[in-house]
From Swiss-Prot:
Record bears the keyword Transmembrane: yes
Gene Ontology CC annotations of this record: plasma membrane
HAMAP family: UPF0756
One Pfam short name: DUF441
Family the UniProt entry places it in: Belongs to the UPF0756 family.
Name used for this protein in its record: UPF0756 membrane protein Dd703_1075
Subcellular localization, as worded in the UniProt entry: Cell membrane
Record InterPro entries: UPF0756_TM
TM region(s), chain numbering: 8-28, 51-71, 81-101, 114-134
Recorded topology in the membrane: Multi-pass membrane protein
Top-level taxon in the UniProt lineage: Bacteria
Keyword set, alphabetical order: Cell membrane, Membrane, Transmembrane, Transmembrane helix
Length: 150
C-alpha cells in the first residue's frame, strides 16, 4: 500500500476550500506551493519558511502605502485623519489592529501548530459568512491574547 502524502492531501483540501469559498488568495498560494514542491524549486522551501511571512507583510505594506506614494491620497488628507473624530478613531483602531497583527506574527512563528486552525477558520469564515480572507494575522493576535504569546 502506498504511503499517504499528508502534506499534499492538506494542500489539496485547502485548494478545494479556496475554490469553493472563492478565496483566490488561498487557491493561488496552494498552487504556488504545489509548483514549488513538485519542481526543482523545492530547494527554496527553507527560504519561503524563513522569510515568506516577512515578504508577504512587505508586499502588503507596499500596497497600503501605494496610494500615498502615487499621490492619490494627499498629505492634507493624512493630516485630516487627526482632526476628525471618525478619522482619529480609525487611526486608533489601525494602531490596535497593527499591534494585534504583530502579536499574531509572533504567535504563528512561535506556535506553528495554530496556523492550520487559523487557515481553516479563515476559509470557513469566507465560505459561510461571506467574510474576506484578511484575518489570519489578526485572528492569531486575538488568539495570543487568549492563550499567551508563547
Amino acid at each position: 500500500m502506498a504511503s499517504l502524502d499528508s502534506p499534499l492531501l492538506i494542500l489539496l483540501v485547502l485548494a478545494v476550500l479556496g475554490i469553493v469559498s472563492h478565496n483566490m488568495t488561498i487557491t493561488l498560494a496552494v498552487l504556488f506551493l504545489l509548483v514549488v514542491r513538485f519542481t526543482p524549486l523545492n530547494h527554496f522551501f527553507p527560504w519561503v519558511e524563513k522569510y515568506g511571512l516577512s515578504f508577504g507583510i512587505l508586499v502588503l505594506t507596499i500596497g497600503v502605502l501605494a496610494p500615498i506614494a502615487s499621490g492619490k491620497i494627499a498629505a492634507s488628507e493624512v493630516v485630516q485623519a487627526f482632526l476628525n473624530w471618525k478619522s482619529l478613531l480609525a487611526v486608533i483602531i489601525g494602531i490596535a489592529v497593527s499591534w494585534l497583527g504583530g502579536r499574531g506574527v509572533s504567535l504563528m512563528s512561535n506556535q506553528p501548530s495554530v496556523v492550520a486552525g487559523l487557515l481553516v477558520g479563515t476559509v470557513i469564515g469566507v465560505a459561510l459568512l461571506r467574510g474576506v480572507p484578511v484575518g489570519p494575522l489578526i485572528a492569531a493576535g486575538l488568539l495570543s491574547l487568549l492563550i499567551g504569546k508563547g
